Every structure is written in structure tokens, then in C-alpha cells.
């Protein structure tokens, strides 16, 4: 049986955070696809092998929640984990209404992200 890669896509306009999440996920057995913008991800979405999308709520002038809604409208069912430094309850509510499987407030500990990935629905293989 061929080895099945477990790919997680991360979208964050902060390159330091993007790189840190890439290293964290790689250290825990995940392959990563790293995108610095909503448009960068959308350009690659048709070839993405991601089992989960981790997206920042605020992507510069773009909105990660709008990205998730756009993907859902197009029929994509990949689970989304939102992260943000915005601690307003209204942001968390909007993210959950957009279908988030998890919502992480920055700064968050690595275990919170890993636990969110481990709790993905069946069929979303975890290393």
C-alpha cells in the first residue's frame, strides 16, 4: 500500500508565523503547503492535497473568514482551523458560523493546534 501524505495548508500573511507553523507541523509528521496570501492559496487550491486549512482571520486587507466562505460556496469541504490575534468574541462567532472546526487565539500553544488537527473528522488521516 502506498504511503499517504498528510498535508496541511497554512495561510498567514505574517511570514515569521507562517514559517514557524511550517516547522512545527513538519516536526510532528505533517507535510505543509505554506501560503502568504489568500490569492496565493486560491492560485494553488485546485492542486492542493491538504486535509486541513489553517488560516489567519486577518490576511492584510483580506479576510480569512471570507476565504473559507468562498471555498465552501465552491463546494470545498476541507476542514478549516482559524487563528487570530483579534480577541473580539464577534470574530470567533463569525469564524464558527463559517464552519471552523477550531478557533485558536494567538498566541496559542503548539499543543492546541496539534489537538485540533488530531480531532479532525474520520477520513482526515493524522500522522
Give, region by region, the residue ranges found by the protein language model:
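Alpha4 helix (beta4-alpha4-beta5 surface) of REC/receiver domains from two-component response regulators
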Residues: 66, 87-102
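Short amphipathic alpha-helix used as the core "switch/output" element in two-component signaling
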Residues: 43, 65-76
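Two-component/phosphorelay signaling modules centered on CheY-like receiver
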Residues: 15-33
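The feature encodes the CheY-like receiver
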Residues: 18, 60, 88
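C-terminal output helix
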Residues: 90, 108-118
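Active-site beta3 strand of CheY-like receiver
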Residues: 48-55, 59
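Acidic catalytic/metal-coordinating carboxylates
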Residues: 36-37, 63-66
Amino acid at each position: 500500500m502506498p504511503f499517504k501524505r498528510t498535508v496541511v495548508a497554512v495561510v498567514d500573511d505574517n511570514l515569521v508565523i507562517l514559517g514557524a507553523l511550517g516547522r512545527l507541523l513538519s516536526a510532528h509528521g505533517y507535510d505543509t503547503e505554506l501560503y502568504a496570501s489568500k490569492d496565493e492559496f486560491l492560485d494553488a487550491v485546485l492542486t492542493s492535497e491538504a486535509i486541513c486549512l489553517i488560516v489567519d482571520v486577518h490576511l492584510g486587507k483580506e479576510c480569512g473568514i471570507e476565504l473559507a466562505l468562498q471555498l465552501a460556496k465552491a463546494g470545498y469541504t476541507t476542514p478549516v482551523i482559524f487563528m487570530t490575534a483579534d480577541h473580539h468574541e464577534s470574530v470567533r462567532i463569525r469564524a464558527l458560523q463559517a464552519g471552523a472546526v477550531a478557533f485558536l487565539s494567538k498566541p496559542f500553544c503548539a499543543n492546541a493546534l496539534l489537538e485540533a488537527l488530531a480531532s479532525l473528522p474520520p477520513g482526515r488521516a493524522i500522522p
